């Protein structure tokens, strides 16, 4: 913390720094000094650690050196990118005054604030991932949640009651920056997120939020958006919008509306399901061998981002799904023609966001122009389709011939990175600019003529005319001939072997050229800003076009994937159940070297719960996951890896597949397993698809079997959910005899001596035996251990069979029975009523010895 008592002891420049820093106490301040951005005090220490840069010292504060660190201005974007990825925010303070005319420190001002959730610069963004800013609110009515993608203007809200539901939503949206009220009671829910920002309660005030939102959208109320009753979510949305306005410090015309996400509109998946199905991230945290890695060959970044949104929010609206199916079928014929043109569109969505924020760079406008140039070819290909949905997309894409012509006239073919570099506006666009440029560009001819004239007039063969950034134009003569220069040559600089002079004629020309360069750059900047004014009135149509182009890219990509990977169009049915013929796992079939064995799946009202048995490594988990992934693909409108698929109504997908210790939360494997199981039993419905893999294996045999049995009963009898229930408890294979709608299936395998061949083929009925020893042998367990295990297995099986035979009528299922103790046998044969007190005492000692 900076001591205000010592403020007057600082230099004027440091006083200026301290005033600016006081306005931004919680974030890093990049303070421009010449060619560097400097940081001081705790900011310097933090930046030195995070960026691995040198920590130095400058001046003194209360007798102690001031810590300082700095980064060069030309490389600032790289350092900002690193800080943003670490969840840090940075205030950028620039010199806005002229050092030449400033009395005291040059005037400085914070011109932008870079935060993880509000960045729009392409160098700071992951191009194929959404960059979401979020806000969360909680009170006794539930949770309100709002997300905004500043790079597209997509603004969404939702409301939830249960903690599990908001946890799943946070997992799905994965915001890079999260705003929460200072009174928030569920910190455990959000503590693992980067970019947490604690905000005062008044920023979540409901009336202020409504006022802010109406002001942003130019509306009197929020009824038209269907969000006026969502008071919890509106509190979060109001805080979020205010935060963006504070950081961007400019209008936000690309944020034109807000939508309410309702749970009944999508197939709900909790955090565990998203993780287990490896949609966009595998269990190791990378993107390899995920569903997205197989499906996403989109040619535009905005298409790739849209596809990932679809995967994480499958829709239940039949009309939307059938529109997509119809479009994919059409694009199988014309999609390959479209993709080369779509490839040239680039990331139009994010270019438009930068245009809206008036931060678009010259190359952004060139990219926009290039995108417009592709539209006639895209329309020509789409004209050949008679699909109503393709026609609707074509209408939304539109044409921007006038804007294309404007940018072709205004911007050079290959513009520089920044407008301050000049040379952005094309020749012929503005006559005044052309005149000033001609004056500046004519300098080289004039200087050549002056050099020839002066050299001949004075007879000095070493004379030459030049320019440098410090001293401007000069006439240079060697030291040996310097005594021959005329009196009107005024010395400007002395070098080791030469003298440099200025003459009135050259000075006059210098003033004119420098004026012309400054003037032409000023005109260019004004014309560039004017281009924004000409483009921004079309922002709404441009955003609609970008969204339609992104969707066209997704659909063309899914058409190519369907054609290449042999996917078929699933039938969406109102009848409960899932019927799949020749189903395949979309990811596993791509990474396997040998052919993938396809399998059927049949779930219906009469066949609700499948008990799946078979060897470890036999393919149970793959089979279960493939059922969920095929269902999910059908609910994003995609074709699916199968010979035939009929998919009935599905409201949720649950998975209880595999588990590991959650050490961070202090939960064991079994606790994780039971928490996920409890979530399923509380929230699954008759229309849910439930995958349960090896329930109860994390505890003792009796406990585990009892829990697995009770869970299966509950799912089959009470919930009646469509369930795939894999188990190693063979006792559960008797359930079909006791419960309606329960069926046994198994994954086949064939044993050859000590080896095993997995057939990966699903068959009706229970597995005939376990293959644990064969799998152990395959894993390399020593031969003598396998041999001993085989002997022990025979002993245990004979004991188990004997116990089963002698207790045929007992309801308890036979497990691995232990040999009866001699003490137990003695007690069974003992008649306590015939014993004297002394004999009873002797028997106690005798039984103790037996034990």
UniProtKB/Swiss-Prot annotation:
Native species: Photorhabdus laumondii subsp. laumondii (strain DSM 15139 / CIP 105565 / TT01) (Photorhabdus luminescens subsp. laumondii)
Family classification: Belongs to the DNA mismatch repair MutS family.
NCBIfam families to which the protein is assigned, alphabetical: mutS1, PRK05399.1
Pfam family, one: MutS_II
One GO term (biological process): mismatch repair
Gene3D superfamilies the UniProt entry points to: 1.10.1420.10, 6.10.140.430, DNA repair protein MutS, domain I (3.40.1170.10), MutS, connector domain (3.30.420.110), P-loop containing nucleotide triphosphate hydrolases (3.40.50.300)
GO molecular function terms attached to this record: ATP binding; ATP-dependent DNA damage sensor activity; damaged DNA binding; mismatched DNA binding
Stretch forming the signal peptide: none
CDD domains: ABC_MutS1 (cd03284)
GO CC field: cytosol
Protein name: DNA mismatch repair protein MutS
Protein function: This protein is involved in the repair of mismatches in DNA. It is possible that it carries out the mismatch recognition step. This protein has a weak ATPase activity.
Keyword annotations from UniProtKB, A to Z: ATP-binding, DNA damage, DNA repair, DNA-binding, Nucleotide-binding
Binding sites annotated in the UniProt record for ATP: 614-621
